[in-house]
């Protein structure tokens, strides 16, 4: 500590580290340091308390101080011949000002292959008892250590450089700033003061906030809000009790009309970045509001987190400074609805009773990955999909039947098995455990069947409005022939078929084509045909001409080959549906270069309280 400040007092505090319910090693170390700092501040409320806690992490496993020689031996054998992380959490706290600043240091250490004799010889010296990971770098040196990547002082247990920087930030006076513009599409707001730019979070544009600086970058100073001194007129009270932690929503604290304004401005900026400058105001309509701003989602992918008594089900936390996204346990999810509140407790009880553990993608251990819930917002039917890394789970059928008793709307229960490392839901192997293989959803009078992998717009009521605009445009041309590319389950093509003489849908996945044909059949549609094939190839093979081409591509937009195929068709009217303003702008720029004129751009808010939007564009040639 003398490397940091000349005058200080050292005194130990005792905390119960078992009370720290964090599975991430970085968060564990930081939270333990915070507990130490707060405990010390009870005795010295006016002093600047500097507390630290060091852990060793092998993968996601946290290694603290060993209880005895046997545990120390197991730790060292685990670390032998592999890389591990030494993490020190740091907390600076002054109780009289209620100011807290945290940080951490991380160093990668690689051990040589350690023999049992070498480990026993070290343990005989009894230097391991109060050491995280059962060793001290100054005691084992090159005998154990092959390489160190990062701060050596951190491995010793006190990262002097990090602490010096944190003290410098802490001793700076707090700032009173007026948030003058939003940080959209990110959460928070921005401010300018004395020639410097600041990022404020949490904050909304119009807030006056007191902040402390937590990080200085070349272009912007990152701050943390201590107090909202004067709230913005656009600030509202979030409905969700988990808002601010959960990453599912970013803007529940912002009035809905203001959210729509931000999305309109964001869309215009993204289009201008693509070279589409000078678009008249009447071409880009204001964002069309969602019919419902809560309970609008018909599908949610929830994640498991924790272990044992801390097992939880929810959403990944909002991205922050710590490079790990834990699962925030949810009791409710207002953007989805009350079905989650009925399903989640029963699934968690089943998992705890069966002692099922959460899957760790780094080690491959554990079973539980995600829980997907799909709900027909117009029919009330519910599908539950338990995503696991292992196939054989005892009692799963009984659990599904119990869930049916508690939730009569449950139409089907699936198990999805995926062993991919990526933390996403991928449909590799599905097994129907109970009930029907699909649920049904309605758009106006049309019925659509939804299976586990089926793409269906997340906001049912907003989709009706967007699809209705397309149908009305097609209806203005008598006897129109329509080509739908990236048709998925044929929902849009079936919806607009009543206004066309013939509709052809194209999609690369055969299972999507099968669903599209089924949806057309159950609605008695005989003017729609569907073809399996890649958009980059199929249009050139189709006979006849089309009056309209509808493209509804994935987030990345049209590939160069697909774009070339679409432009080669030379149809008089092109309709583009996009969920990504950046790729939309790129493709629209190419279309205008090829001779198309943008007639109207209509953004729809399919995702209230998030930065996302859906955009419908009509082009003519």
Regions found by a protein language model. Give the residues of each.
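Anionic-ligand binding patches
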Residues: 24-172
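Extended interfacial segments that mediate partner engagement and assembly in macromolecular machines
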Residues: 226-233, 237-238, 247-360, 378
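Rossmann-like S-adenosyl-L-methionine
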Residues: 53, 391-621
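Terminal RNA-binding accessory module
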Residues: 173-242, 278, 320, 529, ...
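A short acidic, helix-capping loop that chelates divalent metal ions and anchors anionic groups
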Residues: 17-21, 58-60, 250
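Short, aliphatic-rich beta-strand segments
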Residues: 373, 379-389, 447-451
């Amino acid at each position: 500590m003398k490397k940091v400040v000349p005058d200080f007092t050292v005194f130990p505090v005792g905390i119960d580290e078992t009370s720290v319910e964090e599975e991430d090693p970085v968060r564990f170390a930081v939270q333990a340091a915070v507990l130490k700092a707060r405990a010390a501040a009870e005795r010295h409320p006016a002093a600047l308390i500097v507390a630290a806690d060091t852990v060793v992490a092998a993968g996601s496993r946290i290694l603290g101080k060993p209880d005895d020689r046997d545990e120390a031996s197991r730790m060292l054998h685990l670390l032998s011949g592999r890389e591990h992380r030494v993490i020190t959490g740091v907390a600076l706290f002054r109780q009289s000002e209620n100011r807290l600043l945290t940080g951490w240091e991380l160093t990668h250490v690689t051990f040589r292959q350690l023999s049992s004799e070498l480990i026993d010889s070290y343990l005989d010296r009894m230097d391991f008892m109060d050491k995280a990971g059962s060793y001290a770098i100054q005691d084992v040196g090159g005998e154990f250590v092959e390489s160190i990547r990062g701060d050596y002082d951190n491995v010793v247990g006190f990262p002097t450089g990090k602490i010096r920087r944190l003290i410098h930030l802490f001793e700076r006076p707090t700032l009173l700033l007026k948030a003058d513009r939003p940080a959209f599409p990110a959460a928070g707001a921005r401010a300018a003061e004395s020639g410097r730019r600041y990022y404020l979070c949490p904050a909304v544009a119009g807030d006056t906030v007191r902040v402390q600086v937590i990080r200085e970058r070349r272009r912007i100073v990152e701050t943390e809000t201590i107090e909202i001194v004067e709230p913005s007129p656009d600030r509202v009270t979030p409905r969700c009790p988990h808002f601010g932690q959960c990453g599912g929503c970013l803007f529940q604290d912002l009035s809905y009309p203001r959210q729509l304004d931000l999305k309109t401005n964001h869309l215009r900026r993204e289009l201008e970045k693509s070279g589409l400058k000078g678009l008249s105001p009447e071409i880009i309509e204001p964002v069309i509001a969602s019919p419902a701003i809560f309970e609008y989602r018909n599908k949610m992918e929830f994640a498991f987190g924790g272990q044992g008594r801390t097992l939880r089900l929810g959403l990944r936390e909002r991205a922050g400074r710590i490079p790990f996204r834990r699962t925030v346990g949810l009791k409710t999810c207002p953007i989805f609805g009350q079905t989650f509140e009925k399903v989640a407790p029963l699934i968690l009880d089943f998992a705890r009773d069966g002692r099922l553990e959460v899957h760790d993608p780094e080690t491959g251990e554990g079973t539980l990955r995600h829980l997907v819930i799909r709900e027909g917002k117009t029919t009330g039917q519910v599908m539950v999909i338990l995503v696991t890394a292992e196939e054989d789970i005892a009692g799963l059928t009984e659990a599904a039947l119990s869930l049916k008793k508690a939730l009569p709307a449950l139409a089907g229960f699936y198990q999805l098995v995926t062993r991919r490392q990526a933390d996403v839901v991928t449909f590799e192997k599905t097994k129907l455990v109970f009930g029907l293989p699909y649920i049904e959803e309605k758009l106006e009078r049309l019925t659509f069947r939804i299976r586990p992998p089926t793409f269906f717009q997340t906001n049912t009521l907003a989709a009706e409005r967007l699809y209705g605009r397309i149908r009305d445009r097609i209806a203005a041309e008598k006897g129109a022939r329509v080509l739908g590319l990236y048709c998925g389950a044929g929902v849009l093509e079936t919806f607009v078929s009543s206004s066309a003489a013939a509709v052809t849908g194209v999609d690369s996945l055969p299972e999507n084509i099968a669903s599209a044909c089924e949806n057309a059949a159950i609605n008695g549609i005989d003017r729609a045909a569907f073809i399996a094939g890649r958009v980059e190839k199929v249009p050139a093979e189709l006979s006849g001409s089309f009056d309209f081409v509808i493209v509804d591509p994935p987030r990345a937009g049209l590939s160069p080959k697909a774009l070339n195929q679409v432009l080669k068709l030379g149809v008089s009217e092109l309709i583009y549906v996009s969920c990504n303003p950046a790729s939309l702008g790129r493709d629209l720029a190419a279309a205008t270069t090829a001779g198309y004129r943008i007639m109207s751009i209509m953004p729809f808010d399919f995702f209230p309280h998030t930065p996302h939007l859906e955009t419908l564009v009509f082009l003519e040639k």
